[in-house]
């Protein structure tokens, strides 16, 4: 393999555009793959702007060889639309880094990647699509990966970029902590409000109660998380910019399908599996499912 792996990226949305721009900044521009042939990608951040030249390829038949590293940055609701891309871009020597929410990426993707190794990740930076189709990166980019041999390929690819990459020997705990953060974001969908809503005392109390329910499930699944985690997560939302959104709220406001199952339904599913009461999930999950899928 050359000094740096051949790289493709599927899904140039907010997270995908961020990773593509960071790689482009150091002359490792990935092959861009998606549904729409955008002529370019634009990332804005505190220090300026990065323009990644396109076009975004929208036909898997235009490529005829696998890549060393594939970043998969589509939402889990869009994975079914990516099967042709995964079959084209992957073989048994490929590492697929899933830049996705949830704790089930490996199980969900392994049957689709043509023998490649699936590497889950935790994405720690907020990036949001703007009305002009650019992406606004609102914090320093950071990824956490499991400390396994295939992670080295991602570390090598992102070395020298603005994105910090951390390896964790207890990735299960890290992934579940991020899932708790994502889960409580579901409350924003039902209120149709951004992070400012967490400054309300009643919402903060509801969020804490829900996060404690989530914490019990996370621990049953093997996560080692302190009792302080629910309050820490609420504090993050409380002190965030009032206009900070989350991807599931953006999807609801755009009338797109929601990742309700992998962000919230998973708590209910594993709770029932372990015999853990999930009274808040039992109300929240059907409402999120209905918001996503209707009818009505």
Task: Enumerate the language-model features and the residues they cover.
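NAD(P)-dependent Rossmann-like dehydrogenase/reductase catalytic/cofactor-binding core
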Residues: 2, 208, 212-296
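Rossmann-fold dinucleotide-binding core
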Residues: 65, 99-178
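Nucleotide donor/acceptor-binding cores
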Residues: 5-6, 68, 141
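Helix-loop-beta segment of a Rossmann-like dinucleotide-binding subdomain
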Residues: 133-143, 190-198, 244-254
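Rossmann-like NAD(P)(H) cofactor-binding subdomain of soluble oxidoreductases
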Residues: 19, 33, 37, 49-132
């Amino acid at each position: 393999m050359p000094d740096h792996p051949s790289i493709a990226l599927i899904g140039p949305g907010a997270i995908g555009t961020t990773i593509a721009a960071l790689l482009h900044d150091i002359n490792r521009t990935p092959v861009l793959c998606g549904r729409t042939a955008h002529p370019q990608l634009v990332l804005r951040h505190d220090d300026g702007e990065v323009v990644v030249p396109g076009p975004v390829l929208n036909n898997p038949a235009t490529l005829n060889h696998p890549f060393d590293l594939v970043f998969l940055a589509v939402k889990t609701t869009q994975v079914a639309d990516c099967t042709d891309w995964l079959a084209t871009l992957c073989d048994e020597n490929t590492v697929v880094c899933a830049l996705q929410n949830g704790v089930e990426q490996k199980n969900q993707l392994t049957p689709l990647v043509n023998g490649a190794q699936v590497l889950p990740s935790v994405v720690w930076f907020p990036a949001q699509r703007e009305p002009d189709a650019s992406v606004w990166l609102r914090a320093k980019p950071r990824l956490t990966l499991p400390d396994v041999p295939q992670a080295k390929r991602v570390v090598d690819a992102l070395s020298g970029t603005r994105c910090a990459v951390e390896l964790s020997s207890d990735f299960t705990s890290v992934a579940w902590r991020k899932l708790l953060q994502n889960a409580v974001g579901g409350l924003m969908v039902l209120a149709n409000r951004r992070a400012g809503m967490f400054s309300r005392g009643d919402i903060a109390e509801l969020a804490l109660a829900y996060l404690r329910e989530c914490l019990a499930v996370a621990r049953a699944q093997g996560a080692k998380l302190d009792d302080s985690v629910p309050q820490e997560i609420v504090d993050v939302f409380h002190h965030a910019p009032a206009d900070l959104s989350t991807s599931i709220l953006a999807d609801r406001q755009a009338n797109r399908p929601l990742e309700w199952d992998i962000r919230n339904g998973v708590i209910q599913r594993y709770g029932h599996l372990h015999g853990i009461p999930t009274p808040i999930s039992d109300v929240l999950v059907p409402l999120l499912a209905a918001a996503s899928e209707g009818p009505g």
